[in-house]
Every structure is written in structure tokens, then in C-alpha cells.
Amino acid sequence: MSNEYNWLRQLNLFFVATGFFTRLPTPSWVIADDNELKKSSRYFGLVGLLIGLICALVYWFTQQWLPTSVAVLLAMVAGVLVTGGFHEDGLADTADGFLGGKTFEDKLRIMKDNHLGSYGAIVLALILLLRWQLLVELALFSPWAAITGFIVAHTLSRVLAASLIFSVKYVTDLELEEGKRLSHDQSLNDLFILLASGIFVLFWLNGLAAFVLFISLWALRFCLCKYFRSQIGGYTGDTLDAAQQVSEIMCYLIILAVGLSA
């Protein structure tokens, strides 16, 4: 009975993560309270893998009848539809806050504003354009290269973003609250399971590309931690979204520059 309960609990956590990050339907029996959401971080990478697979499938089918650039764009649209633009919205809010605010309080206040500012619009447009161009270049090399890019980037970017909650403080609009650090409610097992999904997709790449991508993402994670601390003293949900977007671009860049799937 205990093994069955554990299996059902893990399945529940995966569906909680899926429901949080995507607009995909989840079973009605799923329990999605705050505690389950915090524990579901272990499966954020697997949700990224699922999103990457959906984008890859859309690209694979459309590239057989449509030009490469159009097929890539449709795959990107599919990704936005699946997630509801969840991470893109957070990236825009972060850009508005970090670039438009002068003080700690100003940055957080701007980030909480639902209106899109000029900084957010510019950064979002550049990220989307760069993502499209990089994926087109991968697709022109071979369809398999683009498929690999979708799967690897969507998975690893969410692993990196989720890993930040284990080492950076959570920030509210008033002060740093030690008791609200999500990492206090998570264990090393959560981190190991999260990282395992990232290691799994690295096997889609050849040895050199996998090694360089691992080192590059580790360095990016270090820089993001320092940058978030310098800007607002920690992280918010929006900054995690920004981390996901930036690290996704990093994945495409490394795969294109260093090497493609074996």
C-alpha cells in the first residue's frame, strides 16, 4: 500500500507541475495545494521535456509541407499556446522592473504591474526573434537538430530556473522573508530528481556539446544568482521565468555553435 501511495503521490506532483506551467488538462483527482506545488518542483524539468516534445512534434509534422521558417514559427506558437506565455510574461515583467526601477522597492512594484512597459516589450521581442532565428538555423542544418534543440532547451531551461529556489532567497514586495524560501520546504531528493531530468536530455547531444552546455549553464546559473541578488536581493516568480527564457536561448546558442546531436 505504501508503494502504491508513493507512486500516486509522485504522479500527483507531476500533474500539479503540469497544471502550473501549462494549460494542458489534468485529472480531476489531482490535489494542487501550496504544499504539493512546492514539492512538485522536482518535476519541472519533466514538464519542460513534455513541452519540448510537443513543440518538436509540431515542427516535425509541419516541416514536411511548409518552409522551414514557417514550421519553426508554428512550433514556437504551439509552445506559447501550451504554456499560455507563462515565462514570456515573467521575462517582460523582470525587464521592466530591473531596467526601469532605481530602488529595490521600485523594481518590485514595477514587476507587479500588469501593464507591459517599453523595456519589457523590447526584451521580449528580441528574445522571440533570437529564438526563432536560432531554431531556423538548427532546422536548416537538419530537422533532427531542431527537434533536439526543442527537447533539450525546454527541459534544461526549466531545470536551471527551478534550481535557483534551492540557493536564492524568495523576495516579497516588502522585505526578504527567510521563512518564505521555497527551498526550506524541499529536500535534496527534490533537487536530485530535478537534475536527473536535465542529465537525461544531455544524452541527446554529442559529448563535446553536452559538456560545453553543462558548463555554460552552470556559469549562467551562477551569474543569474548574483544578478538577482544585486537587483532585488533574491528571486521572485518573474525572475525564475526570466531565467528560463535566457537559459533556453543559451541552449540553442551552444548547440548551434559547438555541436549538434550525435
UniProtKB/Swiss-Prot annotation:
Catalyzed chemical reaction(s): alpha-ribazole + adenosylcob(III)inamide-GDP = adenosylcob(III)alamin + GMP + H(+); alpha-ribazole 5'-phosphate + adenosylcob(III)inamide-GDP = adenosylcob(III)alamin 5'-phosphate + GMP + H(+)
Entry annotated with the keyword Zinc: no
Alphabetical list of NCBIfam families matching this protein: cobS, PRK00235.1-3
Molecular function via GO: adenosylcobinamide-GDP ribazoletransferase activity; cobalamin 5'-phosphate synthase activity
GO cellular component: plasma membrane
Coiled coil: none
This protein's name: Adenosylcobinamide-GDP ribazoletransferase
Pathway where this protein functions: Cofactor biosynthesis; adenosylcobalamin biosynthesis; adenosylcobalamin from cob(II)yrinate a,c-diamide: step 7/7
Task of the protein: Joins adenosylcobinamide-GDP and alpha-ribazole to generate adenosylcobalamin (Ado-cobalamin). Also synthesizes adenosylcobalamin 5'-phosphate from adenosylcobinamide-GDP and alpha-ribazole 5'-phosphate.
Disulfide cross-links: none
Segments crossing the lipid bilayer: 11-31, 43-63, 66-86, 121-141, 146-166, 199-219
Keyword annotations of the record: Cell inner membrane, Cell membrane, Cobalamin biosynthesis, Magnesium, Membrane, Transferase, Transmembrane, Transmembrane helix
InterPro entries the record matches: CobS
Enzyme Commission number, as recorded: 2.7.8.26
Any Pfam family the entry gives: CobS
Subcellular location(s) of the protein: Cell inner membrane
Biological process per Gene Ontology, one example term: cobalamin biosynthetic process
Family from the record: Belongs to the CobS family.
Annotated membrane topology: Multi-pass membrane protein
Primary location group: membrane
Cofactor requirement: Mg(2+)
Keyword Oxidoreductase on entry: no
